[in-house]
């Protein structure tokens, strides 16, 4: 049985989906009900109901590796497996090589975290810390500044539309990178994409972090800065977020978190610039709108009246 979506992503990909399902243990591919899952910006995601269970199947889109957006598939898949074993991500049921796909346990009755009330900030801090303090080691390191350079290089090569005043932005971001002075010895396993759809709330109130395409070992304050900017936290909220995470009010760590929001928005601008040149993207995802939002947040970060104080306080 097939449920078609308006953009016919399922219609185009159904043969590959069912071929992959034949390689997932305990799944009857022939009788499976397959639905398109909208909202993903990288791979083709499907919800499968079969043999009394529900799973998520991700058909891998390897084109993103070729332009420096995500790490090679084996790295991302192993990171996803680790996150599931930690208990913060969704458990992986199978890795399929032909077609390249990942089958994950469906997390039932989960909804994206609502940034309302008093408890969502400390709960998000706790979820991030669960990953960071897990003792796991992902299979790659992640530096958003270096990743942005790779993606902008790919974007230039592909004739992408770059932001206005690009060279000036490069110089301003370079000052932030110099101040933050990333050091590999400080790195912990990081999600690196902590925005609404990737932070799910279970019926019991637990938070789960899904989608490890951008994951890697990195500076924990990058995850905090990413969440702070994507959840549009004001300064008071960022202070509460950092205090919940670090169990203290520390102006140095708050400043680092705020400056890592610059890194986040710069890297995502680069990502969306590349994405807008790609042929096999998902029709229901607004890549241009995401680029506009990343640029808006980046300009807000760099025009903050206390940017100089942030740079001073964040220095090692």
What are these regions (language model features)?
Residues 1-32:
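Juxta-kinase regulatory segment immediately upstream of eukaryotic protein kinase catalytic domains
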Residues 221-252, 263-282, 293-297:
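Active-site activation/catalytic loop segments of kinase-like enzymes and analogous catalytic loops
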Residues 5, 158, 164, 272-316:
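ATP/Mg2+ or Mg2+-diphosphate-binding catalytic cores
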Residues 87, 128-136, 180, 203, ...:
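A general structural signal marking secondary-structure boundaries and capping sites
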Residues 23-31, 85-88, 180-184:
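Short secondary-structure junctions
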Residues 35-57, 177-222, 236:
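Active-site acidic catalytic loop and adjacent metal/ATP-binding pocket
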Residues 35-143, 160:
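ATP-binding pocket architecture of kinase catalytic cores
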């Amino acid at each position: 049985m097939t449920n078609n979506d308006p953009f016919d992503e399922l219609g185009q990909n159904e043969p590959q989906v069912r071929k992959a399902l034949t390689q997932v243990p305990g799944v009857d591919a022939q009788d499976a009900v397959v639905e398109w899952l909208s909202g993903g910006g990288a791979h083709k995601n499907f919800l499968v109901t079969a043999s009394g269970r529900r799973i998520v199947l991700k058909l891998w889109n390897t084109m993103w590796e070729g332009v420096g957006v995500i790490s090679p598939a084996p790295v991302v898949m192993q990171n996803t497996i680790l996150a599931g074993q930690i208990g913060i991500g969704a458990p992986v049921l199978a890795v399929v090589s032909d077609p390249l796909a990942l089958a994950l346990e469906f997390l039932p009755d989960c909804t994206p975290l609502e940034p309302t009330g008093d408890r969502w900030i400390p709960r998000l801090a706790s979820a991030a810390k669960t990953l960071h303090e897990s003792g796991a080691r992902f299979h790659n390191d992640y530096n958003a500044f270096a990743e942005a350079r790779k993606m902008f290089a790919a974007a230039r090569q592909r004739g992408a539309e770059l932001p206005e005043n690009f060279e000036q932005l490069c110089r301003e971001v370079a000052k932030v990178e110099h101040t933050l002075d990333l050091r590999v010895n400080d790195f912990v396993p990081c999600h690196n994409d902590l925005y609404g759809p990737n932070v799910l709330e279970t019926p019991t109130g637990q938070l789960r972090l899904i989608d490890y395409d951008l994951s890697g070992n990195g500076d924990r304050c990058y995850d905090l800065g990413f969440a702070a900017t994507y959840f549009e936290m004001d300064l008071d909220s960022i202070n509460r977020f950092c205090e919940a995470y670090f169990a203290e009010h520390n102006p140095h760590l708050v400043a680092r978190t705020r400056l890592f929001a610059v890194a986040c928005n710069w890297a995502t601008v680069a990502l969306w610039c590349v994405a807008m040149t790609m042929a096999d993207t998902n029709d229901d995802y607004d890549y241009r709108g995401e680029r506009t939002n990343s640029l808006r947040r980046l300009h807000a970060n760099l025009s903050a009246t206390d940017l100089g104080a942030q740079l001073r306080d964040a220095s090692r």
